[in-house]
Amino acid sequence: MAREFSRTDRVGQQIHKEIASILQNEFKNRDPRLGMVTVSAVEVSRDLAYTKIYVTFFENDEEVMDNYLSILEENKGYIRTLLANRMRMRAVPAIKFVRDGSLSEGIRISNLVDETLNKDKERARNAGRSLDEDEQED
C-alpha cells in the first residue's frame, strides 16, 4: 500500500508549521524590526538537506520587503537552531528564505481586470448603452 504523502512532504509541512510559529512568537522578541510576515510555502529537497521557505510580507514598498528578507537571511542560523529544538531530526535542513511574489502578482492581475472592466463600462456608457444590456442580448 502506497503512502499518501512522501517523507519530504511530511517534513515540509512540519517545517512550515514550526517556522510560522517561530516567526510569529519567538523571533519577534529578538528582532522587532521585522514586520508582519507569513510563511506561504516550504520546499524541502529530496535528501532533506535544504529547504526553501517562501514568505509573504504585508507591505507595498519593495525596499522595505527587501530589508525584511535580509533580516530573515541574517538570522537564519538562529531560526534554524530554534527549528532544531522543536523537531526530532538527525539533521535540520539548511534554510533559504525566498520572497513569495504570488500575492502581489495576484493583486496586480486583479487590479488589471478591474481596470479593464471599468474601461469597458465607460466605453459602453459613451456609446449610449449599458454593459448589462449587451450581456442580456447574448
From Swiss-Prot:
Entry-linked SUPFAM superfamilies: Ribosome-binding factor A, RbfA (SSF89919)
Transmembrane segments: none
UniProt entry tagged with the keyword Cytoplasm: yes
InterPro entries the UniProt entry points to: KH_dom-like_a/b, RbfA, RbfA_dom_sf, Ribosome-bd_factorA_CS
Annotated signal sequence range: none
GO cellular component: cytosol
Subcellular location: Cytoplasm
Pfam families membership: RBFA
A GO molecular function held by the record: ribosomal small subunit binding
BP-aspect Gene Ontology terms: maturation of SSU-rRNA
Domain of life: Bacteria
Swiss-Prot/TrEMBL keywords: Cytoplasm, Ribosome biogenesis
Keyword Transit peptide: no
Cysteines paired by S-S bonds: none
Assigned protein family: Belongs to the RbfA family.
Subunit annotation: Monomer. Binds 30S ribosomal subunits, but not 50S ribosomal subunits or 70S ribosomes.
Job description of the protein: One of several proteins that assist in the late maturation steps of the functional core of the 30S ribosomal subunit. Associates with free 30S ribosomal subunits (but not with 30S subunits that are part of 70S ribosomes or polysomes). Required for efficient processing of 16S rRNA. May interact with the 5'-terminal helix region of 16S rRNA.
NCBIfam families membership: rbfA (TIGR00082)
Protein name: Ribosome-binding factor A
Gene that this sequence comes from: rbfA
